[in-house]
Amino acid sequence: GDTGPCGPCTEIHVDCRTDEERKAVDGKTLVNNDHPQVIEIWNNVFIQFNRKKDGSLEPLPAKHVDTGMGFERLTRVLQQKQSNYDTDIFTGTIAATEKIVGKKYMAGDDKESIAFRVIADHVRAISFAIADGQLPSNTGAGYVIRRILRRAVRYYYSYLDHKQPLLYKLLPVIAKQFENVFPELNKQLDFVSKVVKEEEDAFLKTLEKGLIKVEMFMSLDGVKLIYEGKSKEAHTLPGKLAFELYDTFGFPLDLTKLIASEKGLKVDEAGFEKEMQQQKDRSRAATTLETEDWITVNDIPSSKFVGYDSLEAKAKVVKYRKVSGKGKELYQ
């Protein structure tokens, strides 16, 4: 960041190329150059200064090393594999997926191969998170879990032609594999499986309809816009449609952007945010309550709590008032 603890850093890179490739091109020239076989596996930051707003550096009284290692990448290097997904971290999950969907993982750059890798990565992440106490939801960290899960569902639905819940069937494989280092998943396997399957069921009910909406835009609305000379609009998914996919069909915005990009479209994110804000405003207005004055019917000076000793008790209404909201009238 612009301010706060900082210091010089060093990175550890490994050249995973063949001897012939190393002789042909010096690995130093490929560091931090997005080469798939020359990878960073470790980073060390030597925290020793505090950077102030004016940019000056103030020495810290206590110094330390902030270190981070890429577990999957280090495993790849130690096991001498060409990809993280060729290591035994993922091969068991990929093999189990092959059996369920009846397709062979080809380890290529095609959509099917990518789907296998997305599923193997995402199902491990969500299963660990749920076992650790984070349930899928529509807000905060819970929504991150839901987004990851739904992205995996979309991949097996669209590219592995599998239309039934799949992820929950992979959990026993992961639980067994990691039982010595993360026993929590194995202990809560039934619960985590139930949560994941319910999430899959819920999204699968709306996924196809949402995908049809995108196809309709491309085949009908998009063609119409091109005919009208609005080529730019034809290649942009409207914010209103993106919000409908989110609100009605459960498509996270990042999933809609992924689907759109695969079809050569962009998403009107500003339009999406506008629709989102309008819905929040409507929701706030709808939850506004109007309360009338209290009406006293029994003048009782005090009451005694008896809940610690009894589950039932007779009582008298002391006072009440009318509460109006969402077109309804209630009394409290």
Cite the ranges covered by each PLM segment.
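A glycine- and charged-residue-rich anion-binding loop/surface
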Residues: G1-Q332
